[in-house]
Amino acid sequence: MAIPLITVLSRHCNFSNISVGKDRPKWFDRKKCLQNLIDTKSGEVDLNVKILFDGVQKTDHYVNDFDIPIININGGTGAKSYLRSIEYAKLLKSKYVYFVEDDYLHRQNWDKILLEGLKEFDYVTLYDHPDKYGDDYKNYKSNVRLTKSIFWKEVPSTTDTFACSIKTLKEDFDIHYDFSNRGHQGSLDHLRFLSLKDKGKHLYSSLPGWSTTVLSNYQSPLYDWKSLVDR
């Protein structure tokens, strides 16, 4: 089998303690998020999608409805699940890896946008986190860059949904490992990226966002994300 340019690791589980009780729109559906990830690829980027499943999926779990390889990992918490993900990714032969949590939606041709960023920056996210426009960041100054078809802005941190080269992941593995191993539930993503910035690594977010987490008050702005699941 040919080695893909990008390996997409879509992470799922039967139940998540840190996800329970989060405020989500009524139209949110994890199966539709996974279907959207597949349906919105351009087909022009050499990539391979794999499911990383924390634990053993139930027989009626939606991941079984997809013709996608499933790799079972043993995490048990969000932090340990992310830890198992980076351990798996470190051994990949592809040039890049894209970690995707199970509650994300993507716009059409997200793979082409992602690749533009990966060719330029250490770390890339397609999620334009709305907290960057609140009072906490009103004095924050960011570098803005332009690639072939989109703007990018440097951001201090993002979630566990991001992309980088395997080379970069290996270079920074100790930092990723440390902030996952220290997290009791979540993986301390904010502190992780601040530490990476201190090391001289840079994280850029597409502007506008080309993906979003599906939380009621934290969706990437200026796009009708519900339209992606109404199709």
Task: Give residue spans per PLM region.
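Short loop->beta transition adjacent to catalytic acidic/histidine clusters or analogous donor-positioning motifs
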Residues: 5-6, 40-50
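C-terminal catalytic/acceptor-binding lobe
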Residues: 25-26, 166-167, 171-231
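N-proximal low-complexity "stem/linker" segments adjacent to membrane-targeting elements
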Residues: 1-36
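Short loop/turn segments at strand-loop or loop-helix junctions that form parts
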Residues: 6-19, 54-55, 126-129, 208-209
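Phosphate/oxyanion-binding active-site loops and adjacent basic polyanion-contact surfaces
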Residues: 25-33, 74-82, 158, 184-189
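Conserved catalytic core of nucleotide-sugar-dependent glycosyltransferases
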Residues: 105-176
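Short beta-strand-to-loop acidic/aromatic patch adjacent to the donor-nucleotide binding site
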Residues: 94-105
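Active-site-proximal specificity loops/subdomain of glycosyltransferases
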Residues: 52-94
